[in-house]
Structures are given as C-alpha cells and as structure tokens.
C-alpha cells in the first residue's frame, strides 16, 4: 500500500524565517535595515501569492523522482506562471467545493476563439459567489494542476466537470483583456446580423 503524501505547506517555514529575522534584529549583529527589508518581503502579499501557487503546483504536478527533483520542477513551473503574468495581476489559487449545484460561474474564450479562457460571469448566490476569491475578468490558468492556457474551451469545461470533491483554480485578474474580447465578439455578432439582414433584403 502506497504511503499518503502530506500536502506541502510552507506557511510555517515562512513564519519561522520571520521569527529568526526578528531575533537577528534584536541581537544587533547585522544591519537592521536589510533584515527589516527581508522581513517585509516575506510578509508581503506577493510572497504569499508565490507560496500558494508553488504549493498548489507541488501538490498537483505529475513528477516522479526525488523530493529535490520535484521541488526543482515545481520552482520552474512557479517561475513560468509568474513570468507569464508579467504586466498583469499575479496568479492566485482559488479552491471551490464541487456540489450538485455546480461551481457558480461561466467561462468564455479558448484556442478556437484565439483568446484566453476567462471567467465571464460569477452567478449571484452561487458557490463561487458565496466562497469569494473568484471574479469576472479572471483568466483561468489551470484546473486542478492541469494548464488550460492555449487550450480549447471544451477542455476547460471537461476539467471543471470532471473535478471531484473540490476544484483548485489558478487564476489571474486581467479584466481589460476580457472587455476587449467581449467587444470583439460583439462586433462579430453585429457583422453576422448585418449579413443576415442583407441576405433577407
């Protein structure tokens, strides 16, 4: 019988590092400005976002090998996720329970529409709305560790439907791109309506 692997949790280690930095500051052995700067970084929201994405990738990437190989591959995947988001909001992990009522949001876009996959609507009172964390304009990067960047719309739908118990989403808030995409779709719909109208005339 295979041993169960504990999910990775780095929050305790980050807290311990902050505690050690406080001790070093009290000792007066090192310049306090540098220690305080490092402490601010470790306690920042950005560091928390990196930690969350790293932990989620570590727990879901399908990598065989030693813990060192797994950690190295996870670090590379985390850097790739943040590099891809440069100039945009940083990725966040949102976990939602999977219930009979669905997840409570709609998606649009996909490779076939030459656009990323986006959360186009969070249904008021639905699961996503009640749990918070997910908003209209979030780009969907992965579903339970499987990347949906550059994928067909249907693949994201299948992954969301196949999720059991709960679903972990990595998302990034980029509402301007969603607005541009919706404007493009509206132009296409208007052009189609004009063509249909002309063909009936």
UniProtKB/Swiss-Prot annotation:
Subunit structure as annotated in this protein's UniProt entry: Forms a complex with CASK and CASKIN1. Component of the brain-specific heterotrimeric complex (LIN-10-LIN-2-LIN-7 complex) composed of at least APBA1, CASK, and LIN7, which associates with the motor protein KIF17 to transport vesicles along microtubules. Forms a heterotrimeric complex composed of MMP5, LIN7B and PATJ; the N-terminal L27 domain of PALS1 interacts with the L27 domain of PATJ and the C-terminal L27 domain of PALS1 interacts with the L27 domain of LIN7B. Forms a heterotrimeric complex with DLG1 and CASK via their L27 domains.
Domain L27: from-to ranges: 10-65
Entry's Gene Ontology molecular function annotations: protein-macromolecule adaptor activity
Residue span(s) of domain PDZ: 93-175
Name of one Pfam family that matches: L27
Keyword Cell membrane applies: yes
Database matches in Gene3D superfamilies: 1.20.1270.460, 2.30.42.10
Membrane topology: Peripheral membrane protein
This protein's GO CC annotations: basolateral plasma membrane; bicellular tight junction; cell-cell junction; MPP7-DLG1-LIN7 complex; postsynaptic density membrane; presynapse; synapse
Key words of the record: Cell junction, Cell membrane, Exocytosis, Membrane, Postsynaptic cell membrane, Protein transport, Synapse, Tight junction, Transport
Family statement drawn from the similarity comment of this UniProt entry: Belongs to the lin-7 family.
Domain of life: Eukaryota
Protein known as: Protein lin-7 homolog B
Domain characteristics, as noted in the entry: The kinase interacting site is required for proper delivery of ERBB2 to the basolateral membrane.
Residue window of motif Kinase interacting site: 1-13
Keyword Transport annotated: yes
Gene Ontology biological process terms in this record: exocytosis; neurotransmitter secretion; protein transport; regulation of synaptic assembly at neuromuscular junction; synaptic vesicle transport
Subcellular location: Cell membrane; Basolateral cell membrane; Cell junction; Postsynaptic density membrane
Function: Plays a role in establishing and maintaining the asymmetric distribution of channels and receptors at the plasma membrane of polarized cells. Forms membrane-associated multiprotein complexes that may regulate delivery and recycling of proteins to the correct membrane domains. The tripartite complex composed of LIN7 (LIN7A, LIN7B or LIN7C), CASK and APBA1 associates with the motor protein KIF17 to transport vesicles containing N-methyl-D-aspartate (NMDA) receptor subunit NR2B along microtubules.
């Amino acid at each position: 019988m295979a041993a169960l692997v504990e999910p990775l949790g780095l929050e305790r280690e980050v807290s311990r590092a902050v505690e050690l930095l406080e001790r070093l500051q009290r000792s007066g052995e090192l310049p306090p400005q540098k220690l305080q700067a490092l402490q601010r970084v470790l306690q920042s929201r950005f560091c928390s976002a990196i930690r969350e994405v790293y932990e989620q990738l570590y727990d879901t990437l399908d990598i065989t090998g030693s813990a060192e190989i797994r950690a190295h591959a996870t670090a590379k995947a985390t850097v790739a996720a943040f590099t891809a988001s440069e100039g945009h909001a940083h990725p966040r992990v949102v976990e939602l329970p999977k219930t009979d009522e669905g997840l409570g949001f709609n998606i649009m876009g996909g490779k076939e529409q030459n656009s990323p996959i986006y959360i186009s609507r969070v249904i008021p009172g639905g699961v996503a709305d009640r749990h918070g964390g997910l908003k209209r304009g979030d780009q969907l990067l992965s579903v339970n560790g499987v990347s949906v960047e550059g994928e067909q719309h249907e693949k994201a739908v299948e992954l969301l439907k196949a999720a059991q118990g709960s679903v972990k989403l990595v998302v990034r808030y980029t509402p301007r791109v969603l607005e541009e995409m919706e404007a493009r779709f509206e132009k296409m719909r208007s052009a189609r309506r004009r063509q249909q109208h002309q063909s009936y005339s």
